[in-house]
Regions:
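Hydrophobic alpha-helical
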Residues: 77-84, 189-210, 287
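Segments of small-molecule ligand-sensing domains
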Residues: 271-281, 292-358
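Extracytoplasmic "Venus flytrap"
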Residues: 1-25, 49-53, 140-145, 276-282
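Extracytoplasmic ligand/sensor domains, especially the bilobed periplasmic-binding protein
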Residues: 68-168, 214-241
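Extracellular/periplasmic periplasmic-binding protein-like sensory domains
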Residues: 206-286, 368
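Beta-alpha junction/loop-to-helix N-cap segments that form part of ligand/metal-binding clefts
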Residues: 15-19, 35-103, 112, 169-173, ...
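Short, well-ordered beta-strand elements
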Residues: 1-5, 42-46, 133-135
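Short, polar/charged alpha-helical segment
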Residues: 13-37, 153-154
Length: 378
């Protein structure tokens, strides 16, 4: 198997997800120490894709050349580069983080979550419960253009007005102008920002402009806000205290993550790259859980890319211990919309930052399939 992610880069704007390959290697140590997958050794090759399209394609070509059975639990924003190479080699892509739109359209991709689209659709539903008006601050880009319709579907379902759309550059060092617009147009309601790594910068600007004693509810989605970010920016004193956040999985303190935490404690050997609160690490754990189910279903035959694909397409069920709904990728399990044909998991979770921790705002999962199928293509 192969797992890739951006690990080391001299580009200060590049994302770094060193915990992803580290989690994959930790999972393999655990599996192999406990008898393998029905006696088979799990071998993991890691690749640093450097957060570049060239690096992503290089990793994909290496996966094909080394005849790996699957690429599992990886992170890359460059699906337009890696997916064609995997398709040419017939190698499946299992449980990618969801940072590339191609992960939700390629016939060889088997996503374990609904990507940012599901988060936005769910976030509209979450905000619709308590926000009379919403300002959405999002990237001034083609990808950003698809955000308002998804968010608005959830708001409109709660009989709330559509959000106010505020565009922001992704290379800014300050967002005072956008923060002022968001504050003015929120009407005392809610301000949500989905700016990836720049979300922190926006809310720094926003909190400085807020009138004393008048705290507007802020919100975002996982990927733009995370527990490691909250910890790094002050915990309970961070600008995210009180924020609504929509995620894919149960909050990090949920007991369903205990097995993963135990494995990290025993087999990561103190590797500080692995943060069990990090959604990228959690997604890699779930992806390898899916791989394990597929390999077990193959039985005594050789594990090849073709057999992994046939097993997944044939309807093998993946029980993630309640971290997601049961996952299957038969044709009838797919959402099948034009924009997101490969999504099978349309469930999200509603969380809120309390005392510096992401905690469940509402128990269980919320299904946003209807909001995804109603959204226009972005």
């Amino acid at each position: 198997m192969m797992t890739w992610a951006p690990d080391r880069s001299e580009d200060i704007n590049a994302v770094k997800m060193a915990g992803v390959p580290a989690m994959a290697q930790t999972y393999a140590r655990w599996v192999n120490d406990t008898g393998g997958i029905d006696g088979r050794e799990l071998r993991v090759i890691v690749c640093d894709e450097g957060d570049t399209s060239i690096g992503a394609e290089r990793c994909a070509r290496e996966a094909v050349d080394k005849k790996v059975a699957a690429v599992v639990g990886s992170y890359s924003r460059h699906g337009q580069s890696f997916m064609p190479a995997l398709e040419a080699g017939g190698v499946p892509y299992i449980g990618g983080y969801g940072a590339s739109t191609e992960e939700f359209s390629s016939y060889l991709s088997y996503p374990v979550n609904g990507g940012q689209s599901a988060l936005l659709a769910g976030h509209g539903r979450q905000l619709g419960g308590s926000c009379t008006r919403v300002s959405l601050v999002r990237p001034d880009s083609i990808g950003g253009d698809g955000m308002p319709p998804l968010l608005n579907n959830g708001l409109l379902a709660a009989n709330r007005p559509a959000s106010t759309d505020i565009l922001a550059p992704l290379d800014a060092t300050s967002y005072d102008e956008q923060a002022a617009q968001a504050l003015e147009r929120s009407g005392g309601g809610c301000v949500t920002a989905v700016l990836g790594a720049r979300t922190e910068t926006f809310f720094d600007s926003f909190r400085r402009l807020e009138p004393d004693g008048e705290q507007v509810r802020i919100s975002s989605v996982l990927g733009s806000v995370s527990q490691p970010l909250i910890n790094r920016t002050g915990g309970r004193n961070s600008p995210f205290e009180g924020a609504y956040v929509t995620g894919w999985y149960p909050d990090a303190k949920n007991a369903r993550w205990q097995q993963m935490r135990d494995v990290i404690e025993k087999y990561a050997f103190g590797d500080n790259r692995i943060d069990p609160d990090d959604t990228t690490v959690q997604t890699t754990w779930i992806a390898y859980t899916a791989l394990r189910a597929a390999v077990r279903a193959i039985g005594d035959e050789n594990v090849t890319p073709g057999r992994v694909v046939a097993t997944l397409n044939g309807g093998v069920e993946v029980d993630t211990g309640g971290l997601t709904p049961t996952l299957r990728w038969r044709f009838k399990d797919l959402v099948g919309t034009l924009s997101y044909p490969r999504i099978v998991n349309t469930k999200v979770t509603f969380q809120v930052v309390r005392e510096g921790r992401l905690t469940a705002q509402r128990k269980g999962f919320v299904d946003v399939a209807d909001a995804l199928t109603d959204a226009p293509r972005s």
